[in-house]
C-alpha cells in the first residue's frame, strides 16, 4: 500500500488531495457461468491477483453563516485471473470509478442549522444478469448497475448546559435519488415513496 497527500489550512477552511496505489494477492472469484450446487467451493472458485489506485480531494469552507463541504474520488479496482487470460484486467466487484459528495449548511441561530447534502456514484459491477443468472465469460465484469445518487436534508439543534450537551437531529434521506438495490434491502425498514427515509435522533451528554 502506497499513499501520499497534501493538506492546506485556510483562514476559514481547508483542502486536501491524496493519491494511492494498493496491490492484492490471491483474489478469489466465482468462475463465469457457474451455478453453485454443493459445498465443494474449490470447483467454483478461481484465484488471481489485483490492484487498485486513485486520487481523492476534499474541500471545506465557511462564509459567515454558510459552510460548504465537497469531496471527489476517482478510484479503480482491478483483478486478473490465470483462467481468463483473454479478459486481461477486469474491474473488481468493488470498482466504483467516480464518487462525488457535497453538503451545504446554513446556521439559522447560534444553536441550530439546516443542511442539504447529496452524493453521486458510478454503478457497481454486476455479477448476475437481469434474470439473476450468472454471467457468461463474454459478459464477465462487463456490465454495471445504473448511476447511483441521492439528496438529503437535515436540521440539527445543539445546546450546552454548563458541562452538559443536548443534540437533536431530524431529517430525510433520499428526498430524490436512485439507490443500490442492496442498500434498500439492507438498511430501509421504514420508508416513504421513492425510498425516502425519515430519521431522527436525540442525544444528551452529561
Predicted feature residues:
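Conserved C-terminal beta-signal and adjacent last beta-strands/turns
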Residues: 91-206
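Flexible, solvent-exposed coil segments and beta strand-coil junctions
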Residues: 31-41, 75-85, 130-137, 179-184
Amino acid at each position: 500500500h502506497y499513499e501520499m497527500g497534501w493538506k492546506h489550512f485556510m483562514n476559514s477552511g481547508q483542502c486536501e488531495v491524496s493519491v494511492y496505489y494498493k496491490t492484492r494477492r490471491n483474489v478469489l472469484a466465482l468462475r463465469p457461468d457457474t451455478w453453485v450446487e454443493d459445498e465443494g467451493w474449490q470447483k467454483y472458485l478461481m484465484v488471481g491477483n489485483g490492484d487498485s489506485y486513485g486520487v481523492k480531494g476534499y474541500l471545506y469552507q465557511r462564509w459567515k453563516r454558510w459552510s460548504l463541504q465537497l469531496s471527489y474520488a476517482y478510484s479503480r479496482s482491478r483483478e486478473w485471473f490465470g483462467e481468463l487470460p483473454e479478459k486481461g484486467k477486469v474491474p473488481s466487484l468493488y470498482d466504483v470509478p467516480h464518487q462525488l459528495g457535497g453538503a451545504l449548511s446554513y446556521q439559522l441561530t447560534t444553536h441550530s442549522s439546516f443542511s442539504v447534502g447529496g452524493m453521486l456514484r458510478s454503478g457497481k459491477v454486476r455479477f448476475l444478469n437481469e434474470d439473476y443468472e450468472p454471467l457468461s465469460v463474454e459478459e464477465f465484469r462487463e456490465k454495471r448497475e445504473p448511476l447511483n445518487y441521492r439528496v438529503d436534508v437535515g436540521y440539527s439543534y445543539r445546546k450546552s448546559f454548563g458541562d452538559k450537551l443536548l443534540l437533536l437531529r431530524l431529517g430525510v434521506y433520499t428526498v430524490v435519488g436512485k439507490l443500490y438495490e442492496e442498500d434498500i434491502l439492507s438498511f430501509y425498514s421504514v420508508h416513504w415513496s421513492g425510498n425516502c427515509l425519515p430519521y431522527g435522533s436525540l442525544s444528551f451528554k452529561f
